[in-house]
């Protein structure tokens, strides 16, 4: 029994381990115990700029007849992209490809299942090394061996974007499916996922936790900003427009804000209506260009830019994102991680349960599993990540960039994310369908009793 002592002004002490310990009590301003917070850290101040859950209300819906809880736990490596040219000067662009240290992690059941699939050479690309079959193969054989993978449009286009976070993840699933490797040795399609959960037709998201740690320095100042958002309402419309077609995500345009000079009222006007991620398209000045052309650039070489856009480091910081400093810029502790927690469906309409497999579906096909019949790929939350630096291009808004290089036998991760997620499957069908007929007839076929 530890000895206790009380001093004036409410100071308590306890004697243990050979000395007196001061019990640091919280102020008794409230009836119950509350931790004192600084005013500028209050939730109301942060929600004035970005509200991750802009309102919800509960709706009384009938609970399913039976439920099953599914848990995911794993790690996600946010790595730098690689390029797979056949030679070092493929098309003249291989040595001039630059990427930004950005990522977008979508919380949906489809991508969590893809992240937990078998780690075999025929089922998962396995990180930033896209694989020689994808880089060199352009016939049907490559598509047969690598289903649901993006084939490069030419040999200087990366075959995977940072949105495909599950390619660089190792995820464990509980309960496990002992027959999954034999039934689905390749990447699972929506049809395969529907057959895997053929006995369940509802699902809901309970909770997902992220713990992000910056792992790579980029100059003397390189924190990683991360912001959790509801659904996809911070994603630009152009991302949704081209989300299903990776090959058309590249467009040829002008040099993106690198100091080009234009005259008169042509293109390249420096107004705020032009997205910095979507540079203008000035005409190329050649020897055959007609005289009197009003647009002149310091460099007449046009550049390629991608439709796949992400939030910059400055944008995330302005919205109140957390910062994680890499080792060397701050001592590693629990506070070195960015902690994010997402609960519920994140749906202002109060839709708690979502459709996994539509009722009355005897033969599960991809047409049934695609929206709106199935909501398997519905995004409940999105985690936006970007690394900043003190030296960056003006049009990148403080985001760290790097030159895409050819693959080596190692991956270069600039952030690591620990993930824990809980989902629940439900079924409103009766668990025992063995019914009896009201009447039976033993007469011959075609006659009536």
Swiss-Prot record:
One of its GO terms (molecular function) is DNA binding. GO terms for biological process: endocytosis involved in viral entry into host cell; viral penetration into host nucleus; virion attachment to host cell. Residues 1-43 are annotated as: DNA-binding. One of its GO terms (cellular component) is host cell. Pfam families: Gyro_capsid (PF04162). Residues 6-47 are annotated as: Nuclear localization signals. Self-assembles to form the virion icosahedral capsid with a T=1 symmetry. This very small capsid (25 nm in diameter) allows the virus to be very stable in the environment and resistant to some disinfectants, including detergents. Essential for the initial attachment to host receptors. After attachment, the virus is endocytosed and traffics to the nucleus. The capsid protein binds and transports the viral genome and Rep across the nuclear envelope. This is Capsid protein. It comes from Chicken anemia virus (isolate Germany Cuxhaven-1) (CAV). The lineage of its organism: Viruses, Viruses incertae sedis, Anelloviridae, Gyrovirus, Gyrovirus chickenanemia. The gene is VP1.
């Amino acid at each position: 029994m530890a000895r206790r002592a009380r001093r004036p002004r409410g100071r308590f002490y306890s004697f243990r381990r050979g000395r007196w310990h001061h019990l640091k009590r919280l102020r008794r301003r409230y009836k119950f115990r509350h931790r004192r917070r600084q005013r500028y850290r209050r939730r109301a101040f942060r929600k004035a700029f970005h509200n991750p859950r802009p309102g919800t209300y509960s709706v009384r819906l009938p609970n399913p007849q039976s439920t099953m809880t599914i848990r995911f736990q794993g790690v996600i490596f946010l790595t730098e992209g690689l390029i797979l040219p056949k030679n070092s000067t493929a098309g003249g662009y291989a040595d001039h490809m630059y990427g930004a240290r950005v990522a977008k992690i979508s919380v949906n059941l489809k991508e969590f299942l893809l992240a937990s699939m078998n780690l075999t050479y025929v089922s998962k690309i396995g990180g930033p090394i896209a694989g020689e079959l994808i880089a060199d193969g352009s016939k049907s054989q490559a598509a047969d061996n690598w289903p649901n993978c993006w084939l490069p449009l030419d040999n200087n286009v990366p075959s995977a974007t940072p949105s495909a976070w599950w390619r660089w993840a190792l995820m464990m699933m509980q309960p496990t499916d002992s027959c999954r490797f034999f039934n689905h040795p390749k990447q699972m399609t929506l049809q395969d996922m529907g057959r895997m959960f053929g006995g369940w037709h509802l699902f809901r998201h309970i909770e997902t936790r992220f713990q992000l740690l910056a792992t790579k320095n980029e100059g003397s100042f390189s924190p990683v900003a991360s912001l959790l958002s509801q659904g996809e309402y911070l994603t630009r419309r152009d991302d949704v427009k081209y989300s299903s077609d990776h090959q058309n995500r590249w467009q040829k345009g002008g040099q993106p804000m690198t100091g080009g000079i234009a005259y008169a009222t042509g293109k390249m006007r420096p107004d705020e209506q032009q997205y910095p991620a979507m540079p203008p398209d000035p005409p190329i000045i050649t020897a055959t260009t007609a005289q009197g052309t009003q647009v002149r650039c310091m460099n007449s070489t046009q550049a390629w830019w991608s439709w796949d856009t992400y939030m910059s480091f400055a944008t995330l910081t302005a919205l109140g994102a957390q910062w994680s400093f890499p080792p060397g810029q701050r001592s590693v502790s629990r506070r070195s991680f960015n902690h994010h927690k997402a609960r519920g469906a994140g749906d202002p309409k109060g839709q708690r349960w979502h459709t996994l497999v539509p009722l009355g579906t005897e033969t599960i096909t991809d047409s049934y599993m695609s929206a709106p019949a199935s909501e398997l790929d519905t995004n409940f939350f999105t985690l936006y990540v970007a690394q900043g630096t003190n030296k960056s291009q003006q049009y990148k808004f403080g985001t760290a960039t790097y030159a895409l290089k050819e693959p080596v036998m190692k991956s270069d991760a600039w952030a690591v994310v620990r993930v824990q997620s809980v989902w629940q499957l439900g079924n409103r069908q009766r668990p025992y369908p063995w019914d009896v007929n009201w009447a039976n007839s033993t007469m011959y076929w075609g006659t009536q009793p």
